[in-house]
A protein has these predicted regions:
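Phosphate/pyrophosphate-recognition segments in soluble nucleotide-handling domains
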Residues: 18-32, 155-185
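N-terminal secretory targeting signals
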Residues: 1-19
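RNase H catalytic domain
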Residues: 39-46, 83-155, 161, 165-166
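A composition-driven surface/loop motif
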Residues: 167-230
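RNase H-like nuclease fold core
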Residues: 14-16, 20-77, 81, 85-90
Length: 230
């Protein structure tokens, strides 16, 4: 690539190389893989972030778990990193069926939504797609809906955002009641933006951060839908 690589891509390449060294893909694993990818940012935007990809071979059923820490990023950039890690990890040529709970990532990667932000990453994405002969199928999966692959990717991305501080991660798993109350509103979310908004708000409350008046107003509006439906 002619321009300097982004922080995200540098970390992705390191994580992929380490995983290949520790658990190499061999002939018995075939060329068809399934991946669940995710990203997490503790203080979106420009806060500590993490990405993850849980990759499984259709032939051998072996599973690889990739995760990386980003000192400063955003939710969407971390989500991109998770998907890109899966793309770079599987063999080329090969086939990858990838699941992401980010409508933004799925729709932009498939060309359904216009690219308005993170243009450096999407230019890199185009270059990587041309370089690698990977037949990619990309599907959206609802987050926090008890899908084991998605849940595991979420756990790894959250742990990576904390720079693999297991003690801190365990504390975040003990969800506070305010954060849990926001999580219960997820079925009321309309579109990917509101889904991401609710996850961000739950994350802020979990870490003891206050909401801005605008954030509180949006949260109240979403909660009112549930009351109106009662």
């Amino acid at each position: 690539m002619s321009r300097p690589e982004s922080l995200e891509l540098r970390v992705i390449r390191q994580v992929v190389a380490e995983q290949h060294a520790q658990q190499p893909i061999d002939a018995a694993d075939g060329a068809r893989f399934i991946a669940y990818t995710d990203g997490s940012c503790l203080r979106n935007p420009d806060g500590p972030a993490g990405f993850a990809a849980v990759v499984r071979s259709e032939a051998s059923d072996r599973v690889w778990e990739l995760a990386g820490h980003l000192p400063s990023s955003t939710n969407n950039r971390a989500e991109w990193a998770g998907l890109t890690a899966a793309l770079l990890f599987v063999p080329s040529p090969g086939h990858l069926l990838a699941f992401s709970d980010s409508q933004y990532i799925v729709q932009v990667a498939l060309g359904q939504w216009k690219r308005k932000a993170n243009l450096d990453l999407w230019q890199t994405w185009d270059e990587l797609r041309r370089e690698r002969a990977v037949d990619l199928e990309l599907r959206w999966v609802r987050g926090h809906a008890a899908d084991p692959g998605n849940e595991r990717a979420d756990e790894l991305a959250s742990l990576a955002a904390l720079n693999f501080d297991h003690a801190a991660w365990i504390r975040t798993r003990a969800i506070s009641e305010p954060a849990r109350a926001v999580q219960r509103l997820q079925p009321l979310a309309r579109g990917d933006w509101e889904g991401r908004f609710l996850r961000d708000v739950a994350n802020r409350l979990q870490h003891g951060l206050r909401l801005s008046p605008r954030q509180q107003a949006v949260l109240d509006r979403i909660a009112q839908r549930g009351k109106d439906a009662e």
